[in-house]
Each structure stands twice: as C-alpha cells, then as structure tokens.
Amino acid sequence: MLSSFLITQRLVYGDLLLDAIFPFFLPAAERKHFRVGLNTDAQSFGEWFLLVTGMSVAVFLILCAFVLALVSVLHIPLPDGICDRLKLQLLEFLLRISNEYLGDLVELLFGPVGRNYLTRFLVALPYIFQSRPPKWCTVRQETIAGVRCRVYLPSKEMKKSTAALVFVHGGGWCIMRPNYYDGAMYSLMARIGMTIISIDYQLSPEVQYPVAVEECEAVVKALHAEKHAEFGFDPERIAVMGDSAGGNLTAVLAQRLRAENLNIIKRQILIYPVIHGFDFQSPSYQSYYRHYNGTSLLNPYSMARFYLLYLGLPATRENLRKITENRHLSRAMRNSPAVAEMLNHNQLPQEFLQKEDYEPKEAPEGDKELSERFEKLLEDSNLSPLVAKELAGLPPAMVLTCGFDVLRDEGILYVRKLRKHGVATKWSHYPAAFHGVLNMPVSSQRKQMLDDIAAYLRQNL
C-alpha cells in the first residue's frame, strides 16, 4: 500500500518531492527503485490504469484539501440572528471573493470606475436568464419624459386598483437596473393589482448628481400630466417607492414636489433609504465593524465609494478612508448646534446604544480639502433629505429599516424628523433583515416586507 502511494506521489509531484520528503520514509536504495519504476514497472494496461487512477484520486484529494483550506481561511461567520443565514453565507462568500477581493485588484489596475463596471457585471449575472412574466402581467419598455422606464401592467383579471406605484431602484446611484427587481415587482403586483412604473434613471459615474433626481422628477410629472391615460391609472392616486439610493431619490422627490406646491405623490415608501452622508460612525455603522466586519454586505467603504462616484469626486482609497473616519466634515461643522442636534445618537432606540454595539466618538479633525467640497453638497436637501428645514406638508410615509444595515440609523432619524414636523409616518423595523433583502429570492423576511407594503398601500392609496 505504501509503495502504491509513493509511486502515485512520484507521478504527481516528480523527483523534487521524492528527494525532499521521502528520505524520512525510505533508504536511498529503495528510493532508486521508485525513480526508475515509472519507466519499467507499468508495462501493462492494467498497471497504467491503476497508476493513472491513483494519480487522479490524489489530485482530487489535494484540490479538495486546498479548497477546504481556502474556505476555512476566508470564512467570515455571519451573525446568528440574521435572516436567510445559510443562503446568505454562500452568496456573501461568492460576492466577497469576486466583488471585494477581485474588486480590489481591478481598482488597483483600472481605478474606481473600472471597479464599478466589475460590480455592475457581477450583479447582472443572476439576471442573464430571466423567467417570463406571469400571464397576468405585461411588461413594457417605455420612454417617459426622455427617461427609460419599465412598466408592469396587470391584466383585467388581476387589476384590483386604479392607483399606480412608481418604483425607484437602489444600487448606490451607480449599479442595478429595474429588471433586477422583477421578482419583487411581480410579487407585489400579485398583492395589490395596480400598475407599476420602474424608473431606469442614468447611473453614475457616467452622469453625476443631480441628474438622477431630475430624471425621476420628470417621469413622475409626466405620469401625472399625461401618461396616466396610456397606462390606465388615476393620476390622483400615485405612490412612489424606492430602496436604498432609490429611497433617497424618493424622499428627495417628495420634498421637491412639495416645494413646488405640487400634490402629485399621495404616499412615499422608503425601504432602507440613504438619508444623509454626514455620519459614518453611527451605531449602525459601528455594528457592522463589530458583528460582520469584512463581509460583502453593504459596508462603509462601498457606501463612501458610491457617494464619491455619484457626486463626481475622486473615489481614491485615501478619500474612502477619510470618509469612513468622518473626516469629510470639519470639526466645526460636526459640532455646530444644527448638525449635532440632527445627528444626535440619543434619538435612536436605546437598544441600539448598548456598549457591546456602540461607543460614542469625538468628532475628528476634518480633512480641509475634502471637507470643503463635501460640506457644500451635504447641506443640499436634494442629496441629504434629513437637512431639510421644513417637512410639513409632505405626503404620508412608510419607512422600512433593517437590523443588519449600516443605513439603519439614518432611516430612523428621518422617521423622527418627519413625525416631528407632523407628517404621518409608519415605521416598520425588521431586526433580522439585511440591506438588500428585497433582492433575496425565496425569503420569508422579504415576503413579510412585501406583505406589509401591500397592506399599507391598500389601506392608504
């Protein structure tokens, strides 16, 4: 048995390993036998078959050992309380290998824009082969106010409402497309039976802020003014919904139309929205570092990169590091009464401020060049809805937040400010959910969120 094993290793590794390791097992005379054995021992087909089979098994076992060792080294366990943990553990690992590790290499070679192209390619892969829409839904590609849109029209049998839902997809203003949300849109339509229009706004960095804002506004105005007749819905019953960066655009859109005294939007639904870019050391950001640091779930560096690409600022590694350390703000601005009150962590639920998850931090000294450019942009409510001084008169809102999400706290702060200004606001928090769960197929948590959204729309639109 030992002889067969040694001959197999000789076939796989050659004389180098034979001379380096086998002296511990065999004297020189017997090693010589194995060195010539390759040329003289295997004379028959059966002997060659056994040798090749042994070599194949050895290679297979070595590859298995290598893969197991690699997985063991790279494995980052997800928190026990997170939903869809087994599926997410595999998806997170694959995305981390491709988008994070390979992404770092691509960024080194081709810069942050090249990395963004890689991310777009990777997120598109699961949607290359898409299933046909259900028989009760017609999907059309339309151009509305010069902007591409994906329109979902229910059949006569499925149509339960004359209202319409405008959806603004997420993806950090830089990635994702409306068709990636087909599954969620079909599931939602089955519940509410209304027309859905998903806006395919132009992505950054090809265009920068505020192009996406302006395109979404143009689409909603056109739907209200004229396109409603073509798609068969009541122009006085329009709701707008967005997730992540789409939630940001939805909140901004509601504020802009209110400022123009246009009562177009009757309800706004914000799903784990981006609300401000002031604080990258909030309790929810700190929770990432403490509980799932290094994973490919939405992380501080990705969020900082999205902001920089969206705003047309240099997305260098140095700038990313400065933003995640809150050095994109001057200490004077951070400590100003208005900003300090707006970002006060004590407004958050006490369970998010426990010392195992959170440590209050002093405002660092800001980077002069970066803060001068960033502060002017962050003070614009078209980027940071939280800075708006007057929110009264906005359409009633539903805000959904997730327990495992760096954006959790800004969504909660916006809920508090909306309520403070008299805006009827329903807050639904999902402690086990993670950022991006709307795109997780066969998820009980996604099902619950869609059920809650559908119930809210049926009752209020």
Regions found by a protein language model. Name each.
Residues 78-142:
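An N-terminal hydrophobic leader/cap segment in hydrolases
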Residues 1-2, 55:
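Universal eukaryotic N-terminal targeting presequences
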Residues 9-25, 30-82, 105, 109, ...:
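Alpha/beta-hydrolase superfamily serine-hydrolase fold, recognizing
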